[in-house]
């Protein structure tokens, strides 16, 4: 509800502003905190300018379904399908880029996560050890992935060792760091923060791939600029995102296969 009020307030400000009406872009905290959003905003020259809303993927997708946003970039494939694609709210679907999730935690690694064979096993070891784990707990793409990993591990997290922060990726990682706890992290965001005592303990599983997809939202009054932005973002914008590097010099993001495709209305 708070997000919708904020987006509606943006609309009021747009109506009071002279010049082109801004394009309403909704995206996630990991896009913002990994520097990918700053890259897009700095290179997009319009017209029109961007009016960007940042929130967890679940909130962004619901706002898009309500018609409050024109373009979204999210990283929760199952939620995207359920909230945007299946009901017919997506006009255009464009694979953008992918990063990687990792299990981070204390250097002592009491749950022996670093020697796990799979991400599910890493989560199972955390539960077996009763080691503290900090979750975002906010219906973000990161939280959705985490829940899927607990399910794959056959584990229901227990309150005595499991804490939901209810906040963004950066704040969650800082909280986990303070408590010597494990957490699921988007690698580019973790790298951008720097200065954390937490270490990357496990990332070697294709289940930890983190795909970002851009959607042009189907609206009663479509904004032609939304398609223009989508084309730009998946070409020049994407190349700039792919140029971002982790501290070890490896790419922070890799290319997502596939081109923009019209999403049929059911």
Residue ranges and their predicted role:
Residues 84-92:
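Hydrophobic/aromatic-rich structural module bridging two neighboring secondary-structure elements via a short loop
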């Amino acid at each position: 509800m708070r997000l919708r009020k904020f987006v509606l307030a943006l609309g009021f400000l747009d109506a009071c502003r002279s010049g082109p009406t801004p394009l309403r872009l909704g995206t996630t905290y990991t896009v913002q905190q990994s520097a990918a959003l700053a890259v897009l905003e700095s290179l997009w020259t319009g017209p029109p300018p961007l009016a960007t809303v940042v929130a967890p993927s679940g909130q962004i997708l619901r706002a898009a379904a309500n018609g409050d946003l024109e373009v979204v970039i999210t990283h929760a494939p199952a939620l995207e399908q359920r909230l945007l694609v299946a009901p017919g709210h997506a006009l255009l679907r464009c694979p953008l880029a992918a990063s990687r999730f990792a299990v981070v935690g204390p250097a002592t690694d009491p749950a022996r996560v670093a020697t796990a064979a799979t991400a599910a096993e890493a989560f199972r070891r955390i539960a077996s050890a009763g080691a503290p784990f900090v979750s975002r707990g906010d219906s973000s793409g990161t939280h959705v992935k985490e829940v899927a990993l607990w399910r794959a591990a056959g584990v229901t997290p227990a309150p005595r060792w499991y804490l939901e922060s209810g906040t963004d990726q950066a704040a969650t990682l800082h909280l986990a760091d303070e408590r010597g706890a494990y957490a699921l992290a988007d690698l580019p965001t973790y790298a951008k923060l720097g200065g954390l005592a937490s270490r990357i303990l496990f990332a070697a599983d294709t289940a930890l791939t983190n795909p970002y997809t851009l959607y042009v939202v189907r609206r009663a009054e479509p904004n032609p600029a939304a398609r223009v932005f989508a084309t730009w973002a998946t070409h020049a914008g994407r190349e700039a995102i792919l140029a971002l590097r982790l501290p070890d010099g490896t790419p922070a993001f890799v290319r997502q296969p596939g081109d923009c495709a019209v999403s049929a209305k059911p």
